[in-house]
Amino acid sequence: MPTISELVAEHADENPDGLAFASEREKMTWADYERRSDALAGHLVAEGYGPGDRIAAQLPDGPDVHVAFVACEKAGLVAVGIGPRAGTQEVDHLMSRTGARTLLTDIAGLWGEPPPHERRLGPEDVFLLNSTSGTTGLPKVVVHDQARWFAFHELAVDAGELTNDDVCMSLVSAPFGFGIWTAHVTPAALGAPCVVLSRFDAATAVELIERHRVTVLAAVSTQFLMLLESPAFRPEALASLRVMFTGGEAVPERRAAEFEDRTGALVLQFYGSNETGALSRTTTKDDRPHRLRTAGRVIESMDVRLFGDGQPGCKGPLLSRGYLDDPAANAELFTDDGWMLTGDIVEIDGDGYLTVIGRASDFIIRGGKNVSAAQVEHEVGTHPAVALVAAVAAPDELFGERVCAYVVLRPGHDDLTLGELSDHLAERGVSKETWPEHLVVVDDLPRASGGKVAKGELRADIERRLAP
């Protein structure tokens, strides 16, 4: 099994002028990728960093972050990927937790002679430490080797019928799991170009999709919804798309169908996490109801078992190595007999299709009744005025918790009242227990460094709003 650095070297030799990365400001060929990663690796070795030392990188989501990761691999170092939106508290925490000796925030001018080949990491070596998305509290550190991501890549190639003729675009931050395979691993494995944005902007994404004739898009649910809502969205601009991989958050069926109808691309997803890799996937061969209403069939190479109230545990080649030096967190992540838990509640039907009911921790307990935040979000998201929605628990003296929905409105809609939303849900025949009892209209939803909605901030906000 080749490593990323070996693949980059191969493409630089066979296709030196071929495009490896493009962003809104620059292009990088495979020869550039090889040369720049060689030079940075040489600089790090010359600075005295030894095999296994940890180097943190907090760089914009452009080509440089991939140069840094490959340079660390060539120098025999472990990269610590820190999201570009991480604040100083999170950066300090991750530096301390990993023992990283240096933080790279700009790699311009860091050049040296390429290190000897024998220093390079192998596919089974730890090459990356990244973090959980940190939607609540400080993030944990996840340990990765390349072998798991190449196994993931093979599944992605099969699911989306990917080839080296494709042009990829990843809108997901590279240090996180979704971004690792869509921007760092799969383009290198295919020898295909990848378009990345230093910071997500829907209009810029549309423009670059059209300019580079992107065929494979990777975006979390919120991002593809923002593409749909952007004034810059034009079906002809996205006509080159074949498939879009999404996930990381619940995928709203109605809006996913709208994306397919307006672009002609098939919406696909993997279900899993940074820690587990993937448990299930949809493919181009699945029919539309299964693609958009489920998280796909359980992956054959993964052993999946449901515990208790439907929480899946898994074993198999896609797993990470768990959390770094964190026995307490690993005790929660793994069962005593070695099953890695996802923290979700799911159902698996007789044909092997998996449906996510919600996070085990993402339920609102109203008067002793568990209400799935994901179900609330799905139903609220069907209102024609709603672009984005997040449901959280609001504290309540009588019931303990009540359902609170934060919504971002679609262009052309100036307001939405709780009464109007309730009328809509009543017309749909939605069970009253899932109706929001608090509604907050906001301009945007807060994001954790990994791009997911920071529900901890929303819970704190509604507590402040309701405080006497």
Predicted features along the sequence, with ranges:
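AMP-binding/adenylate-forming catalytic core of the ANL superfamily
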Residues: 217, 308-310, 316, 321-322, ...
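Conserved AMP-binding/adenylation subdomain of ANL enzymes
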Residues: 150-167, 175-216, 230
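Conserved pre-ATP/AMP-binding loop-to-beta segment of ANL
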Residues: 16-17, 114-131, 138, 161-167
